[in-house]
Amino acid sequence: MHLTRRDCFRWGSAALATAGLSACATHPMPNAQTVNAAGTGFQRKRLGAATITAVSDGVARRPLDASFVRNIPLAQVQATLAAQQLPTTHIDVPYTCYVIEAQGKRYLLDTGFADNGGPGTGLLHTHLQAAGIAPASIDTIILSHLHGDHINGLRRKNGELVYPQATVYVAQPEMAFWGDDARMQAAPEAARGGFQNVRRVFNGYPQDKLKLFVPGTRIDGVIDTVPAFGHTPGHTMLAIGSGKERFTFLGDTTNYPYLFVRHPSWHVMFDMSPEQAATTRQAQLARLAQEGSWVGGFHFPLPGFGRLQTRSEGFDWLT
């Protein structure tokens, strides 16, 4: 994907926001979206021989203004939320990672914030332990993309690696984009935060623990990687299983589901190539709805597992 200088200006603020938390996303999280019905911060599902656990890293509240959905009037966005009995003045954005246990290994999909985020985030370790999963038992980490809320959980503020034992997989086109020093220097100052954060996390990372994959291939013969470009140049979905007993982690193919699953053509402010992201979103959600398989995403609340149902426009995520 080719990004113009105009693109860089458009997504520069989003790159800065996802390097940590945007300045407006600093309010404590509401309990309703942080924990499951049992109040544990995780939800577990068996899928054939595999076990999948959705684990909350927390929730951040951000005021809802016209910048959040770039191509739709704010009043229409608010009406969509109101029709679902959801608040219309703010968005409570969940951060949900997943652990897949299959063939004797534990795979963590995305990492959240660790101690790099704002209030209400960085709860992944607490909830992993509540689920009986020791962080040191994670064998492999697979990243959907390299925005800060997905990778900051690899390294604490003091530089300490959070999962020194784990092998980390990154999509080759994603690392090629963010790792390009010339591209970073050519970007406007406002767009450099995301590039700089990737270097903070990965510079000095043990080379034997960092591997690249080509989207569309299978990792360890277990986890399918599905190209879903547009949110970022190498954004990738991750999946396991087959037929209706298949689970797909959307990553950020769609942000807040009550807006962008319902309306795949809407542009969230964080999509780097909005038109491509919308095309990808529509195609992937339509395919998954037709399959009737299980779906979850990084910005989906617990229980974290649902199926997609086609509406007259867009889809519903039914848990």
Report the location of each language-model feature.
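Active-site metal-binding motif and surrounding structural segment of the metallo-beta-lactamase
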Residues: 97, 119-169
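Cap/insert and terminal regions of metallo-dependent hydrolase folds
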Residues: 3-4, 243-319
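Active-site metal-binding loops of divalent metal-dependent hydrolases
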Residues: 57-58, 111-113, 146, 173-174, ...
